UniProtKB/Swiss-Prot annotation:
Protein name, per record: Small ribosomal subunit protein uS19
Similarity section: Belongs to the universal ribosomal protein uS19 family.
SUPFAM superfamilies: Ribosomal protein S19 (SSF54570)
GO cellular component: a single term: cytoplasm
Amino acid sequence: MPRSLKKGPFIDISLLKKVEKSVKINDKKPIKTWSRRSTIFPNMVGLTISIHNGRSHIPVFVTEEMVGHKLGEFSLTRTYRGHTADKKVKKR
């Protein structure tokens, strides 16, 4: 269920401060964050944000199409290795 419009989008305050500082000094270094629940704002476009997936930080370059989505959507937490194949070949 989406967030109520009267509440507005959520962004972690510490992440917002890091983004504003990076935009102000035009810094291109990745911003490291653990806040997967934060919404991507328009002023984040063009920045690289390293999002924690539980094990490591995944660098994500923010584009215009990502605005309005959550950071956690772009850093997968589970690895899918495919279904295991049958070890015995069935004879007919």
